[in-house]
Amino acid sequence: MNLRPLHDRVIVKRLDNETKTASGIVIPDNAAEKPDQGEVLAIGPGKKDDKGNNIALDVKVGDRVLFGKYAGQAVKVEGQELLVMREEDIMAVVNK
């Protein structure tokens, strides 16, 4: 991927939701909600403080994160739909 986010921006790839419920009902693609979890593919250098130093981000490449349903800006890169969002749009990191 040839995409380098700036400042406190993060590139996230949505993770697919389950297409079958616990009771075995299959959910068609057009009825499923957008996933609110994703994998961090790239991070920017961070925001700058008052002295011009970068403040490192709390997330890192490979983290599985939770975010709001409408967070980020959707972009298509090399045929993949990705989200560009600020770190503050990420609500949590999912521990494996």
From Swiss-Prot:
Tell me the name of the encoding gene: groES
Family membership: Belongs to the GroES chaperonin family.
Q: Which GO terms describe its molecular function?
A: ATP binding; metal ion binding; protein folding chaperone; protein-folding chaperone binding; unfolded protein binding
Q: Which UniProt keywords apply?
A: Chaperone, Cytoplasm
Role this protein plays: Together with the chaperonin GroEL, plays an essential role in assisting protein folding. The GroEL-GroES system forms a nano-cage that allows encapsulation of the non-native substrate proteins and provides a physical environment optimized to promote and accelerate protein folding. GroES binds to the apical surface of the GroEL ring, thereby capping the opening of the GroEL channel.
Give the originating organism. Answer: Cupriavidus necator (strain ATCC 17699 / DSM 428 / KCTC 22496 / NCIMB 10442 / H16 / Stanier 337)
Decide whether keyword Lipid metabolism is in the record.
no
Q: Which HAMAP family did the record assign?
A: CH10
Where does this protein chiefly localize? cytoplasm
Q: Looking at the keywords, is NAD present?
A: no
Q: How does it assemble?
A: Heptamer of 7 subunits arranged in a ring. Interacts with the chaperonin GroEL.
Instruction: Read off the SMART domains from this record.
Output: Cpn10
What does the entry give for GO biological process? chaperone cofactor-dependent protein refolding
Q: Where in the cell is it found?
A: Cytoplasm
Give the top-rank taxon of the lineage listed in the UniProt record for this protein.
Bacteria
Which PROSITE patterns does the record cross-reference, listed alphabetically?
A: CHAPERONINS_CPN10 (PS00681)
State the protein's name: Co-chaperonin GroES
